[in-house]
């Protein structure tokens, strides 16, 4: 596995692969890799000739008071995992390389899709995401880029950006990977105390309960949301950020559950904010 910290060298490598007719997959990550990330890597390995994984904890997608400084990092362990998965190139640039002192260019998707859910509680977050992802696409020149369904809103925003700015690549969605007890895998799970970890299982339980309600004929969004709230509020350490039930294609509001429905939530346990979601076909 080749390791690149320099942007120009990464671009030269990517150009060389293209010249040789090789297809390139990109898996963008912030590191501290777990099985969820490795599922993206495995899918990329199956579909493309060359696999690039980027590791960059992106400061501009963290707001004031968020966990940028504390975000877990272990490049040595990450590199070993990626070697095992036969990744061709690891791109891990420094902050000053990605954002020199004079940096003033941002890529932002406007509208309802970025204003609700995580966009409402983390202003500027998605602007940071779309800016860094645009840069990674230009640097690594992938034919396909792999994103996890756990960050459903982010995934849809990136898809919209790619479509509207005509990036010559395909976004591949990869299903959520869960622990045996149902908790969605996340690098932030390491922050949880044993008590918080036990309570965090309520996220998936609430989602499955909502799915069951819909399958049993409930169509009223307010009723489903209220039942989810009651279940989560029964956990003393849980503080709900949002529970959203929206159109799974574009995050638009639904009057009642119909078509493809995304049920998504964000809940804090202590200082740790966790997200999860599932899609129900009605």
Swiss-Prot record:
Location relative to the cell: Cytoplasm
Sequence intervals crossing the membrane: none
Entry annotation: catalytic residues: 37 (proton donor)
Chain residues that bind ATP: 30-37, 148-151, 177, 185-188
Catalyzed reactions: (R)-pantoate + beta-alanine + ATP = (R)-pantothenate + AMP + diphosphate + H(+)
Main subcellular location of this protein, as a coarse class: cytoplasm
Listed GO MF terms: ATP binding; pantoate-beta-alanine ligase activity
InterPro entries tied to this protein: Cyt_trans-like (IPR004821), Pantoate_ligase (IPR003721), Pantoate_ligase_C (IPR042176), Rossmann-like_a/b/a_fold (IPR014729)
Enzyme class: ligase
Pathway: Cofactor biosynthesis; (R)-pantothenate biosynthesis; (R)-pantothenate from (R)-pantoate and beta-alanine: step 1/1
GO cellular component, one term: cytosol
Record keyword Oxidoreductase present: no
CDD domains xrefs: PanC (cd00560)
Pfam families recorded: Pantoate_ligase
Keywords: ATP-binding, Cytoplasm, Ligase, Nucleotide-binding, Pantothenate biosynthesis
EC number: 6.3.2.1
Presence of the UniProt keyword Nucleotide-binding in the record: yes
BP-aspect Gene Ontology terms: pantothenate biosynthetic process
Binding annotation for beta-alanine: 61
Sequence similarity: Belongs to the pantothenate synthetase family.
The protein's assembly and partners: Homodimer.
PANTHER family attached to this UniProt entry: CYTIDYLATE KINASE/PANTOATE-BETA-ALANINE LIGASE, PANTOATE--BETA-ALANINE LIGASE
Its job: Catalyzes the condensation of pantoate with beta-alanine in an ATP-dependent reaction via a pantoyl-adenylate intermediate.
Extra remark: The reaction proceeds by a bi uni uni bi ping pong mechanism.
Protein name: Pantothenate synthetase
Organism: Syntrophomonas wolfei subsp. wolfei (strain DSM 2245B / Goettingen)
